[in-house]
Amino acid sequence: MNNILKRLSIYTREFKYNLKLAYPVMIGMLGHTFVQFIDNVMVGQLGTAELAAISLGNSFVFIAMSIGIGFSQAITPLIAEADGAKKDNDISRIFEHSFVICLTLGIVLFLSVFLNRNLLYSMNQPIEVVKLASPYLFWVSMSLLTIVTFQSFRQFADGLSFTRAAMYSTLVGNAINIILNYFLIFGYWIFP
């Protein structure tokens, strides 16, 4: 019995460290979803057609964003492995390559969503909703470039166990999104 408790105590010592690493990652991942949630809440105040339009646009962007984020997940274990082996040259090489790949993937995903926006018309949605969704889809699809490129930095930092930096930048990004939504959606100050 003592042997089992001893092994369990060795195992549980890592819980605190793992949670310290994991909670910023979880909050950061929720931050990506929170942007679309806030957009839905704020645009929903304009009307049902506007809400339907951004929901339709977000369905396209969510698929592309999931591909970009999923693709970038490979960076973290590669960086962590190189960091654990104290191979600084490998860390820089992995980061440089992952940045270029994520930037390229961001461009490809943006173009894929942007060039296929006419698919909105074949989704049996009211024409009013599609006309509202098309310009929204353009602006939101542009964010794919920054999201996927940001992921290369985020996964790099996560691989080095600096998980809080990405969490803080995601929280700041969400705050900026709320402020800009307020001005751009409702047309306050100098915005139409």
For the regions a language model picked out, list residue spans one by one.
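Interfacial/gating helices of multi-pass transporter permease domains
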Residues: V43-F62, E128-L132
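Small-residue-rich hydrophobic transmembrane alpha-helices
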Residues: L51-F110, F114, I147-A166
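Transmembrane alpha-helix boundary and packing residues in multipass membrane permease domains
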Residues: V25, M29, V41, P77, ...
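Helix-loop interface residues and adjacent transmembrane-helix termini in multi-pass membrane transporters
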Residues: F34-F37, Q45-T48, A82-A85, G159-L160, ...
